[in-house]
Every structure is written in structure tokens, then in C-alpha cells.
Swiss-Prot record:
Specifically methylates the N4 position of cytidine in position 1402 (C1402) of 16S rRNA. GO terms for biological process: rRNA base methylation. Its main location: cytoplasm. It is an enzyme of class 2 (transferase). This is Ribosomal RNA small subunit methyltransferase H. It comes from Saccharopolyspora erythraea (strain ATCC 11635 / DSM 40517 / JCM 4748 / NBRC 13426 / NCIMB 8594 / NRRL 2338). It is found in: Cytoplasm. The keyword Metal-binding does not apply. Belongs to the methyltransferase superfamily. RsmH family. The gene is rsmH. S-adenosyl-L-methionine binds at residues 50-52, 69, 103, 117, 124. InterPro entries: RsmH, SAM-dep_MeTrfase_MraW_recog, SAM-dependent_MTases_sf.
Length: 330
């Protein structure tokens, strides 16, 4: 993500013009068996700029797509992009843990495909005044939904040193979390934080020089942690994954792309729990109805190719996992 932000700062251009969906061909390949058997329904839980959705609609003429996004700007732009398929598209302003409610609002209970492309979107990174990118001085906002109440500035200015340390350590995996938190508390006593440039300067000073030379941009982990906290990303994902898996019809498939280890571990655990037998290990035979609900379609997490990473820096950190429902839940 650091390399991506630096490149955006250097070469300009809007997300709408330069958006390249990550692992597009692999996503289409994995979802195709579930979507090519006549009329089908797929949910793009992280619609963003609509690149994956556009390709799915083009590949499957009988497909109905439900697109979810918490960002009203993303819904508007994706709606323009998907306008040629508007009779087969339902766009819903929702966070993806509102999965069941979104489907119920469309009188749907089961779906044939589910797609999650997690993390911050190209659109959000390119909109400087939203504060996601540390390469630009901007308001400390970081809300994926501009109508949400809590901003990154609120976190920085109101959390205790202990709370800040927890956020930085848990969500940024920042080994200097306590040191950074103490520096934030000292600095905000002089004046509240409201711009990202001041925070970046603090992080340069707080992170030891040796780590700055070897550990990437010193702001990377803190900005990730603040973004996750502001948007409750891990809590939302923890609720969304089981809801999405529950809604998959038998034969339905789900693809999840994550961009840091915290998300990927959650996806791995959610899939592993459903892919194992519920029969007690000391019994010699499988109990009826206790077999796995899903089968894994990927061996571990798949990575983007070197060629894709070179062409699309956002793909450098992607981890893709996929699964197929093979039986109804007990």
C-alpha cells in the first residue's frame, strides 16, 4: 500500500480513469461454475468502482447483481458504470455486515455467488480530502461513509494512551505502538490533530531511524490502524463472513480478497470452520448431517502474479481465498 500511495502522488489521474480490478481473471474463473447455470444472483459486497461487477455482468447475461457499498460516492460512480446492465443490477447503500438485511429488502434469501474485495478503494485513496493516503496533507477523516460519526481526528484526540496503543498494536501490528501513542498524547495537548501532515511528521520522529530504513513508510501501519478503527472494519468483517456463507446456495461460491494479515486470518478461520466435519474425532464414521458445509477452492491464499503486481501495485498485497458450499448447514 505504501508503494501504491507514493505512485498515486507522483503520476496523478483519477481512480475512475485508472481503476484496475485486482485478480479479475481469477475471480471470474472461480465464480463462473456457480453463475453459468442459467439465472443466478451474485452479491458484490464491496462494490467500489464496479470493475469486478461489470465483468461479471458481461460474462453472464442472465446474472442478477446486488452491489453493496457504504460509500455513497462509490455507489453513484458504480451506478454510472453499470448503467448498461441496470435492469439486472440492484445497488444498496449498506455496510457488508448488513448482508442479510440487504437481501431481505430485495426478497432474496439465497445467492449463487459472493465477492469481497476488502480494504480501502482506489476512489477513496484518490480523494485527497478524505485523509486515507499519507502521501498528501489532508483532513484526518478516513471514513468510508462520510455520514458516519467518528473520524480519525476523533480517535487521535479523544482516545487514552492505552486505547491508542491497543488500536495501533492490534490493527496496525505496530511494534512501536506505545511509543507512538505517548507522542500523540503529548502533541495533542498542545493542539488537537486535524491534518494528516502533522501526524506523519510525528510518526517520522517517533519511529526509530533503523526501522524507517527497513520497515517501509513509518506512517503505513498507523494509518492502517486508524482506518480500521474508524470504520470498525474487522468487527464488520467478523459479522459479514458468516452471513454471506449462510446465504450461499448449494453449489454457490464465495471469493474474498484481503490486503493485510488481520483480514486474511479471519477469512481463513471462517472458511476452515465450515470446511471441517462436525463429527467427534473419536467416532469411526461420519455422523449424518455432520459433514463439511463448504469445500476450499484455493490451497491457502493465492497471490497475484508478478506481471499483475507490476501493472497494478494494489495487487502486491492481495491474498485471495475461495470456497464452495457443498451442503446446507445443519
Amino acid at each position: 500500500m505504501a508503494d501504491e500511495q507514493q505512485r498515486r502522488a507522483q503520476d496523478g489521474g483519477s481512480a475512475r480513469d485508472r481503476h484496475v480490478p485486482v485478480m479479475m481473471e481469477r475471480t471470474l474463473e472461480l465464480l463462473a461454475p456457480a453463475l453459468s447455470k442459467g439465472p443466478a444472483v451474485v452479491v458484490d459486497a464491496t462494490l467500489g468502482m464496479g470493475g469486478h461487477s461489470e465483468a461479471l455482468l458481461a460474462a453472464h447475461p442472465e446474472l442478477t447483481l446486488v452491489g453493496l457499498d457504504r460509500d455513497p460516492d462509490a455507489l453513484r460512480l458504480a451506478g454510472e458504470r453499470l448503467a448498461p446492465h441496470s435492469d439486472r443490477v440492484h445497488l444498496v447503500h449498506a455496510v457488508y455486515d448488513e448482508w442479510a438485511e440487504a437481501l431481505a429488502g430485495l426478497s432474496l434469501s439465497k445467492v449463487d455467488g459472493a465477492l469481497f474485495d476488502l480494504g480501502v478503494s482506489s476512489l477513496q485513496l484518490d480523494e485527497t480530502d478524505r485523509g486515507f493516503a499519507y502521501a498528501h496533507d489532508a483532513p484526518l477523516d478516513m471514513r468510508m461513509d462520510s455520514g458516519a460519526p467518528r473520524t480519525a481526528a476523533d480517535v487521535l484526540n479523544t482516545y487514552s494512551a492505552g486505547e491508542l496503543t491497543r488500536v495501533l498494536r492490534e490493527y496496525g501490528e505496530e511494534k512501536f505502538a506505545a511509543r507512538i501513542a505517548a507522542a500523540i498524547v503529548r502533541e495533542r495537548a498542545k493542539a488537537p490533530f486535524d491534518r494528516s501532515g502533522r501526524l506523519v511528521e510525528l510518526l517520522y520522529d517517533a519511529v526509530p531511524a533503523a526501522s524507517r530504513r527497513t520497515g517501509g513508510h513509518p506512517a503505513k501501519r498507523t494509518f492502517q490502524a486508524l482506518r480500521i478503527e474508524v470504520n470498525a472494519e474487522l468487527e464488520v468483517l467478523g459479522r459479514a463472513l458468516p452471513a454471506a456463507l449462510d446465504s450461499l446456495a448449494v453449489g454457490g461460491r464465495m471469493v474474498v480478497m484481503s490486503y493485510h494479515s488481520l483480514e486474511d486470518r479471519m477469512v481463513k478461520r471462517a472458511f476452515a470452520e465450515r470446511a471441517k466435519s462436525k463429527t467427534p474425532v473419536d467416532l469411526p464414521v461420519e455422523l449424518p448431517g455432520h459433514g463439511p458445509e463448504i469445500r476450499l477452492l484455493t490451497r491457502g491464499a493465492e497471490l497475484a502474479s508478478d506481471a499483475e503486481t507490476a501493472a497494478n501495485p494494489r495487487a502486491a498485497s492481495v491474498r485471495l481465498r475461495a470456497a464452495e458450499r457443498i451442503k446446507e448447514a445443519v
